[in-house]
């Protein structure tokens, strides 16, 4: 049962020395460190040891979304060339997108932005996201997607101080379905060679898609976390993936979610109590008191203080245990956030394991 403190936003705070924020990914990717968490222990390993840390028959479920070049730089028309940043969030139609804009105060409905050869007009203000609905003036039959690789940049988290030499470093090696505005970072540690070693040990994998959206960037503001709401994100769990998961469970294997996005996608698809194919939007918000329906263990990075991701992990292992593990990680010089190290939360560590 959750403790009343588990619903307090302040109870998810911790102090992280700035030098523990990873500014660059390690190379090779699977040389990152891995804290392996069981019911009673937290052991130090490396990610390339994952095949030996799981059991034959276990099934890894991964998110194959790809980060789009969502950051556009333009000029406000008629404002002496004022620079404008447009951060695309979601395609609403062939011509319209939901976006965050800077400077927001100067971009009211009717404002026109020149982005390369394209003009875009602010239509409305979206109250939920504080963003703008923007309509792009495109040639007939065109969609903005065909312009993004030329006009856009892959957005990096705000705590990353320097651009990457190669933006593929912020994509998983299996990213194939464009649509995310942030990477599913638990998957950044995998390499083709690691997948081969996992297969040799009898550990298979399958994919789903969840396009990571604005919720990644929005801090929790409600003092009582139960009053927080996540922005909807599009996801798909295919019939083939459902069959793979059901077969693995029937054979005695464990379902290991790679990242919090996979947890939310699977739990959405199992909302009826039985995992079923799902294609649509979800705003599932997991925090202490939630009873998982399908996920048994998972891999996740170390998350920002007071974030909904900390609350999700706490729903599985408890808030106090999570904060203890984070302090141990700081003491042991682990690297935090998107390019940082990871945790493998084994089923025995989850107090509400299925």
From Swiss-Prot:
| Annotated catalysed reactions | 7-aminomethyl-7-carbaguanosine(34) in tRNA + S-adenosyl-L-methionine = epoxyqueuosine(34) in tRNA + adenine + L-methionine + 2 H(+)
Signal peptide range? none
Extract one GO BP annotation from the record.
tRNA wobble guanine modification
Q: In which pathway does it act?
A: tRNA modification; tRNA-queuosine biosynthesis
EC nos: 2.4.99.17
Alphabetically list the UniProt keywords.
Cytoplasm, Queuosine biosynthesis, S-adenosyl-L-methionine, Transferase
> Is Chaperone given among the entry's keywords?
no
Question: What GO molecular-function term can you cite, just one?
Answer: S-adenosylmethionine:tRNA ribosyltransferase-isomerase activity
Q: Tell me, how does this one assemble?
A: Monomer.
Name recorded for this polypeptide? S-adenosylmethionine:tRNA ribosyltransferase-isomerase
Q: Which gene encodes it?
A: queA
